[in-house]
């Protein structure tokens, strides 16, 4: 055997025991470690700590239970986020608690309640939009005081109105092109 191979084999024989930082040790997969000598490590596995109802620390978690003797069947269920939230709320809370939780959840997501504009507010905003689709801060603040709204709601309304105008313009351009192409094809 060559000296290099002898050195390599001696290094393999004198290899230190696996580190406690190894992936196998961290995941709890190393079978070689002695249970009595190693300290007990409790891994964070919330799916094991849950009760049968799926409630942990006041939070509702729906945990699928799979029977070992049955083949696993996966069905694609497409629900909207709103439907999923509604189902979870129905399972976890009573009627009066559900509304409170939904409001808190909306606040947590950073959402605010939708602003309902009156007809008169919309008419005034539309009139200003026809004159100037990009009003400055002074105009928006004046509108806010007249309409009893927040200035940021006015700003968002103008952004949404410009997007709506752009979308309708794009759709009308598409229809013009479509009509001209269909007339050329018929000729």
UniProtKB/Swiss-Prot annotation:
DNA-binding stretch(es), residue numbering of this chain: 110-169
Cysteine pairings via disulfide bonds: none
GO CC annotations on file: nucleus
Keywords: Developmental protein, DNA-binding, Homeobox, Nucleus
Cell location: Nucleus
Major place of residence: nucleus
Gene Ontology biological process terms, A to Z: forebrain development; negative regulation of DNA-templated transcription; negative regulation of transcription by RNA polymerase II; pituitary gland development; regulation of neuron differentiation; regulation of transcription by RNA polymerase II; Spemann organizer formation
Gene3D superfamilies: Homeodomain-like (1.10.10.60)
PROSITE patterns referenced in this protein's UniProt entry, alphabetically: HOMEOBOX_1 (PS00027), HOMEOBOX_2 (PS50071)
Keyword Endoplasmic reticulum among UniProt keywords: no
Presence of the UniProt keyword DNA-binding in the record: yes
Tissue localization of expression: First expressed at a low level in the late blastula stage (stage 9) in most cells of the animal half of the embryo. Following this, predominantly expressed in two zones; the dorsal blastopore lip (Spemann organizer) at the beginning of gastrulation, and subsequently in the anterior part of the neural anlage (the region of future forebrain).
Any one GO molecular function term: transcription coregulator binding
UniProt record similarity statement: Belongs to the ANF homeobox family.
Job of this protein: Regulates the earliest stages of development of the anterior neural plate. Plays a role in forebrain development by inhibiting the expression of otx2 and pax6 in the rostral region of the anterior neural plate. Necessary for both neural differentiation and neural patterning. Controls Spemann organizer development. May act as a transcriptional repressor.
Subunit structure comment from the entry: The N-terminus interacts with the LIM 2 domain of zyx.
Protein name as it appears in the record: Homeobox expressed in ES cells 1-B
């Amino acid at each position: 055997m060559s000296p290099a191979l002898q050195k390599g084999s001696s290094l393999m024989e004198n290899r230190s025991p696996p580190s406690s930082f190894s992936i196998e040790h961290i995941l709890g997969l190393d079978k070689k470690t002695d249970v009595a000598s190693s300290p007990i490590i409790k891994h964070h596995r919330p799916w094991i700590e849950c009760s049968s109802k799926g409630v942990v620390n006041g939070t509702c978690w729906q945990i699928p239970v799979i029977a070992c003797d049955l083949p696993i069947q996966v069905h694609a269920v497409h629900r909207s986020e709103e439907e999923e939230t509604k189902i979870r709320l129905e399972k976890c809370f009573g009627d009066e608690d559900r509304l409170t939780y939904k409001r808190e959840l909306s606040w947590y997501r950073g959402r605010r309640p939708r602003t309902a504009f009156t007809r008169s507010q919309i008419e005034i905003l539309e009139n200003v939009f026809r004159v100037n689709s990009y009003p400055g801060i002074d105009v928006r603040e004046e509108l806010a005081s007249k309409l009893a709204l927040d200035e940021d709601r006015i700003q968002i309304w103008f952004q949404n109105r410009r997007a709506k105008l752009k979308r309708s313009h794009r759709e009308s351009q598409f229809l013009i092109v479509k009509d001209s192409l269909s007339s050329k094809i018929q000729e």
